[in-house]
Every structure is written in structure tokens, then in C-alpha cells.
């Protein structure tokens, strides 16, 4: 039903966001190519979720701006979808109705198809409360993808899942991203998750980009490889603000 959707290009231009006297993001500049998978990591309160809200159009910058496919972003676009840590399913609607929410023509066939993509076609007629946490997040992923977005924003969507389910969801998200070609923008606390999924890992500290690291490893990523482990540990050191971290060495690792 879908063949290689074009991902959106994002240009973040001198972006600042302040709440009162507190500056959360400070003169941020970032370019994301169409179809690229970006992971944003950093300590709690560093501004990564605020950045995602700004890119989604759910919030507005104090100064600076964001271009989505060359056009100023002023509100949530129909080509952008957000997936949160909580599935946010409507308990009074069945699974297929949650997925098809807001769709019009042929919505049932579209919803059924995307449920098949996430492995839940046989649960379409069930209520959300009978599903496991991982299954509910699969429904949330299906709901985000059913409208065929060009940009998928992922706000720590796997943070509440157990380790095995989280790993399964990571593989699922990666497979669907590779198949569809949308741009993916992931906010996560999990450095291993970031290195496993992203084309680039970006570390934010005190509202600024402190590291923008390409991860040039073949997919699917071998998490036991020495290079993967070295990159993961080096990014973690940067997140933990270890002064001995050498950014030039990081860039050499990715080649």
C-alpha cells in the first residue's frame, strides 16, 4: 500500500526557547535530511523534549525558527505525527477504531493494513485494556503511521516497556522506517537505543548541541561489536559530561 514515502527535511535556525527567565534551548542550529533517523539524548531537563514539541508544532519558539520542507513551521502539520511514552488510546474505542481515528475514506482497510504491519491484525476488534503494554504501544505506532507521515516524532515511546518488549519495538520501528522512508526524530534517555537506531546521535547539554555524531554502522546494528560498544560508551561519557571525552576520537570511530 505504501512505497518509499519521501521524508521531510528539517532546518532548525538559531532556535531559542525560554520559559520566563529560564532558557531551555539556546541558539540551536540543526539540519535533518529527508529520510534521516536522528536521536536526541541528554540528561533530564536538557531541553530534548522541548525541542521535539517545537519541531512538532505543539509549541512555539521564543526566537529563531523551524523550516519543514522549506516552509516555516507554525502549527502541527498533517505530514507530521508524534508517538509518546504513553499510548494514549481511547479506552471506549476498539483497537481498529483507535488506529482509524480521524481518517475518512477507506479508513477500515487502511487501519487493518497498518495493524498487520505492526503484528496486531488479529487484535483489531479488541479493547485496549486487554492488551499488554507493548501491544498498546504497537497500536500507538500504527495510529501514528496510518496517515503515512513524512516525519515521525518519537518522544521516549519505549521508556515504560520491559527490556525484551523494548528491543522488539526498536526492531519494529527500524524496519518500518527503512521500508517507508520517513524522517524519524527520536528523543530517548537510552544511549544504546540511540546508537542502535539512529543515523546521527545528538547530545544536548544545557540547551545547546554539544555533540552531533554520525553512526556509520551497517544495519541491523550488531550491539556486541567492539565499535558499537565504543561509540555507545563514548556518547554516554558525553551525556555524563566527562571532561576526558574526546570529540575528535568519536568522529573517527564513526568512519
Swiss-Prot record:
GO-annotated cellular components: plasma membrane
Compartments it resides in: Cell inner membrane
Domain (ABC transporter): residue spans on this chain: 10-231
Xref: InterPro entries: AAA+_ATPase, ABC_transporter-like_ATP-bd, ABC_transporter-like_CS, ABC_transporter_ATP-bind, P-loop_NTPase
Residue pairs linked by disulfide bridges in the UniProt entry: none
Superkingdom field: Bacteria
Binding-site residues for ATP, renumbered to this chain: 42-49
GO molecular function: ATP binding; ATP hydrolysis activity
EC number: 7.6.2.14
Membrane topology: Peripheral membrane protein
Main location class: membrane
Catalytic activity: ATP + H2O + aliphatic sulfonate-[sulfonate-binding protein]Side 1 = ADP + phosphate + aliphatic sulfonateSide 2 + [sulfonate-binding protein]Side 1
Keyword vocabulary terms for this entry: ATP-binding, Cell inner membrane, Cell membrane, Membrane, Nucleotide-binding, Translocase, Transport
Function in brief: Part of the ABC transporter complex SsuABC involved in aliphatic sulfonates import. Responsible for energy coupling to the transport system.
Subunit structure and binding partners: The complex is composed of two ATP-binding proteins (SsuB), two transmembrane proteins (SsuC) and a solute-binding protein (SsuA).
Similarity section: Belongs to the ABC transporter superfamily. Aliphatic sulfonates importer (TC 3.A.1.17.2) family.
Name of the molecule in the record: Aliphatic sulfonates import ATP-binding protein SsuB
Amino acid at each position: 500500500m505504501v512505497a518509499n514515502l519521501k521524508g521531510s527535511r528539517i532546518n532548525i535556525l538559531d532556535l531559542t526557547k525560554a520559559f520566563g527567565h529560564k532558557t531551555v534551548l539556546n541558539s540551536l542550529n540543526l539540519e535533518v535530511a529527508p529520510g534521516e533517523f536522528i536521536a536526541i539524548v541528554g540528561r533530564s531537563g536538557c531541553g530534548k523534549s522541548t525541542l521535539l514539541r517545537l519541531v512538532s508544532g505543539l509549541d512555539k519558539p521564543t526566537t529563531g525558527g523551524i523550516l519543514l520542507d522549506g516552509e516555516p513551521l507554525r502549527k502541527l502539520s498533517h505530514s507530521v505525527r508524534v508517538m509518546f511514552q504513553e499510548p494514549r488510546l481511547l479506552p471506549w474505542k476498539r483497537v481498529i477504531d483507535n488506529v482509524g481515528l480521524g481518517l475518512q475514506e477507506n479508513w477500515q482497510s487502511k487501519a487493518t493494513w497498518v495493524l498487520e504491519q505492526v503484528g496486531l491484525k488479529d487484535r483489531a476488534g479488541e479493547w485496549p485494556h486487554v492488551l499488554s503494554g507493548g501491544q498498546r504501544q504497537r497500536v500507538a505506532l500504527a495510529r501514528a503511521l496510518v496517515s503515512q507521515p513524512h516525519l515521525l516524532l518519537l518522544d521516549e515511546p519505549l521508556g515504560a516497556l520491559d527490556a525484551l518488549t523494548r528491543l522488539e519495538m526498536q526492531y519494529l520501528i527500524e524496519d518500518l522506517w527503512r521500508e517507508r522512508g520517513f524522517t524519524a526524530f527520536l528523543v530517548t534517555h537510552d544511549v544504546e537505543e540511540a546508537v542502535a537506531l539512529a543515523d546521527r546521535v545528538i547530545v544536548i547539554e544545557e540547551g545547546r548541541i554539544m555533540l552531533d555524531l554520525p553512526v556509520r554502522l551497517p544495519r541491523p546494528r550488531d550491539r556486541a561489536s567492539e565499535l558499537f560498544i565504543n561509540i555507545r560508551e563514548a556518547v554516554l561519557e558525553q551525556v555524563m559530561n566527562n571532561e576526558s571525552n574526546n570529540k575528535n576520537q568519536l568522529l573517527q570511530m564513526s568512519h
